[in-house]
Amino acid sequence: MELKNMELKRKLTINEINFIVDFIQPRPYIPPDIENAIIFKKKKGIIDQLVTIEIYESLIPKLKEEIEKQYVNSLIDPGECVGIIGAQSMGEYSTQATLNTFHVAGVDTGSSTGVSRFQDLINASKTVKIDNISLFFKPLFVKKNITELRKLVASKLIEVKLSHLMITSVIVKTEEISQYRQEIESCIELYNDEHFNYEDYEFCLKITLSRELLLKHRLHPSVIKNKLEEYNNDCKYAFLPISSQQILFFIFIYVNTDECIEKIIQDLMDKKICGVDGIIRYDFKRKDLFDDEWYIETTGGSFSNINCLADIFDLTKTKTTSIWDLYNTFGIEATKQFLIQELKTVMDGVDICHIKLLVERMTYSGTIEPITRYTMRNDESPLSRASFEESFETFLKAAKFKEIEPFTGVSASVIGGKKTEVGTYMCDILIDMEKLNLGDLKTIEDDDEYDYEDDGDLVYVE
């Protein structure tokens, strides 16, 4: 096709885009609400690409013709076994990815792609090998440098317990800490709402706190005292000033039996002082080398616990690598989209249709079902289960419980010598028995609406 003189490339208008995709029409035999959703997704994939291109106006009809041709070629034949095609496509990838791992030197770098990630996704592992959450700052903090950001999140992310902050701990009698009498009384007067006489308590837990860890997490002993009082207000707490040579923290225990003392101490040691449950570390990262915007990648944690940091992080951009964390927080529909995106990232060369089919198989029951040897044995057909593995045990169980074979699956139909309901065998022919009994049924040869061409093909006569 020749271009007109002085014709320039330009963006497509809305009317032109609608003209190009108008060949995609709804099917009359599908419920309208379902079919409209399918048509919308089909058109959206093409429209999203059309809005970005520039083209000569005279080539628009040619573009439409080519898109329609490619669209028709991409349609699967009715009755095709799409499951085995998708399994072959993904099996080829996993085989090649496994071979590629033998050519990578060094140790695991924490990558969220490759064979291990693929296994985590299809097995729906509750304990993934790489459990990360990516946190993005709100616009107010985006332009801050990394030093300011470190100060901002110093005591807010990593889960810190009392046992993490101490160097040593020992149970002593209260009379043995008399040399700290003045400092303890000053602390009680300054940091306690109600005055108490610490000498009324027989035993005391003396803890030496790590100055380095207190500075790292930006904690003051008074913060520790307030947190412990929330958990156990029956014990009393005091500490030496941070300017002391040793930062000592005292817990005055109101019981005098060894078992009770040990239980109280163990409970207090496991109490969280600051941070988010489950987060054991975090790292600052950038999207690329030349990007000034920082984000945080944590190890551990969950979506539900991150919500307490909504004043710092933009929770709409938060990402996780845990399937079950996402499912428990946002539900099955969000999990479906997550699985599609993750599998597309891992298997970049596999068609998206195969991935969507796999995800539908994993989530159609309303929860997440892994694709493993155990879930594949949940078929209602005894022959289909027996064709997978443990044939003898499967037949014994089927006979014991009087299971019925419906012969609806492909494997069972092949074993039983029955025509499988795939391809052209998906359709059944219905006969009008009344007309048959009356002899009114016409053959195709007798029907005036059909005729044969010279090459023998049957055609419809309008």
UniProtKB/Swiss-Prot annotation:
Reaction equations catalysed: RNA(n) + a ribonucleoside 5'-triphosphate = RNA(n+1) + diphosphate
Similarity comment: Belongs to the RNA polymerase beta' chain family.
The organism's place on the tree of life at top rank: Viruses
GO BP field: DNA-templated transcription
Keywords of this entry: DNA-directed RNA polymerase, Nucleotidyltransferase, Transcription, Transferase
Keyword Transferase: yes
Protein name: Probable DNA-directed RNA polymerase subunit 343L
Keyword hit for Transferase: yes
GO cellular component: DNA-directed RNA polymerase complex
Pfam families named in the record: RNA_pol_Rpb1_5
Species of provenance: Invertebrate iridescent virus 6
Regions annotated as coiled coil: none
InterPro entries for the chain: DNA-dir_RpoC_beta_prime, RNA_pol_Rpb1_5
